[in-house]
Amino acid sequence: VGFKAGVKDYKLTYYTPDYETKDTDILAAFRVTPQPGVPPEEAGAAVAAESSTGTWTTVWTDGLTSLDRYKGRCYHIEPVAGEEDQYIAYVAYPLDLFEEGSVTNMFTSIVGNVFGFKALRALRLEDLRIPTAYVKTFQGPPHGIQVERDKLNKYGRPLLGCTIKPKLGLSAKNYGRAVYECLRGGLDFTKDDENVNSQPFMRWRDRFLFCAEALYKAQAETGEIKGHYLNATAGTCEEMMKRAVFARELGVPIVMHDYLTGGFTANTTLAHYCRDNGLLLHIHRAMHAVIDRQKNHGIHFRVLAKALRMSGGDHIHAGTVVGKLEGERDITLGFVDLLRDDFIQKDRSRGIYFTQDWVSMPGVLPVASGGIHVWHMPALTEIFGDDSVLQFGGGTLGHPWGNAPGAVANRVALEACVKARNEGRDLAREGNEIIREACKWSPELAAACEVWKEIKFEFKAVDTLD
């Protein structure tokens, strides 16, 4: 008898506890904090509805499609232990709701509208299960871990980097000089800071030229392949691509992008160009803490990390566990595995809500960066293992004798840790001793150890598992 107008509870349509999830569904785990008086089933169903086919009232055009085929479903709700009135709502989305190969569209659907929803006090997307059918529509990282090692001819150890400081204010020539000294001293990479784009004191083209000169000179002197992450991030996609093309013409191995401020569409565009043209792509996560730091609202970084692997990047900053920036060990290692490994089992103790199969999509190297120095080297080597990039900005440039000795100190410390580990020593217990022994052979390392012997950044992590 026609359609029934009016408002009805979301849970009547979108809460389906008997639903068996399909292998092709995108699964989401939301941390839901309902407004007082809103039952969790209604809150979970509201999230499923508003992030898929639903709207606030019944509409007659519902009759022109098959809601059962296209609607999101809240299929399970569980209370969060130790939190009052907070729940994990599991939502399944049919694959047809999403455009192939578009992280942009995936996020617009899943987190686009629902976070401002009145029935919720707060909402956080904790994890996503990306089905293999959807993974296969993405190129993913331009090259991945193995191809990067082959390009650089560097095996069996973490890679070493350094962010050039002061991040703003240097002229292009002085900037290039700092790059040369770091690379000559033994680092594999130097890095543009995330906010170095093309400012009045240093235009991008000048920086690219001087940095290329620096890395070729350092390569000739050391016999090692060197790189500098040239930041191609720009105000328009066209300008970004112009910078990437110039980097390729210079013959440098790697460019860089700020993927959250630049946006997923720009990032995926750049990643495709990088694969087609043999450039590695370093990703900085500037702005991530705005989205991921609050425990009960936003998007957890593990979701942003998965999204980056799909969109494309060969390196991404992933916290340090030991430095000045946020990151708890188990949670950090959880998303480090999601970045690097091909198959990751569900493991709630590390914050992993779903088993994820990447079906041979290349992996991403996690970058540890922020407030770290030579005394942290044993812990970093143990925590992150070989497939990582360890980046020391102040920990290189703050060396009392200058940049090149700072780079020497870091390289000696790293080689000492890798050697000790390969000999079967326990880096966690004997770390300080290993560094002290290496100081005997390296005055540069001894000087670095003097400067930073007491520094620790110790505050409790804001975002913990409980």
UniProtKB/Swiss-Prot annotation:
Q: How is it modified after translation?
A: The disulfide bond which can form in the large chain dimeric partners within the hexadecamer appears to be associated with oxidative stress and protein turnover.
The residues that hold Mg(2+) are: K191, D193, E194
Query: Which gene name does the record give?
Result: rbcL
Entry protein name: Ribulose bisphosphate carboxylase large chain
Compartment(s) where it occurs, according to its Swiss-Prot or TrEMBL record: Plastid, Chloroplast
Organism of derivation:
Drimys winteri (Winter's bark)
InterPro entries, per database record? RuBisCO (IPR033966), RuBisCo_large_chain_AS (IPR020878), RuBisCO_lsu_C (IPR000685), RuBisCO_lsu_C_sf (IPR036376), RuBisCO_lsu_fd_N (IPR017443), RuBisCO_lsu_N_sf (IPR036422), RuBisCO_lsuI (IPR020888)
Molecular-function GO terms, alphabetical: magnesium ion binding; monooxygenase activity; ribulose-bisphosphate carboxylase activity
Q: Which residues bind substrate?
A: N113, T163, K167, R285, H317, S369
Task: Fetch the PROSITE patterns from UniProt.
Answer: RUBISCO_LARGE
Instruction: Give additional notes from the record.
Output: The basic functional RuBisCO is composed of a large chain homodimer in a 'head-to-tail' conformation. In form I RuBisCO this homodimer is arranged in a barrel-like tetramer with the small subunits forming a tetrameric 'cap' on each end of the 'barrel'.
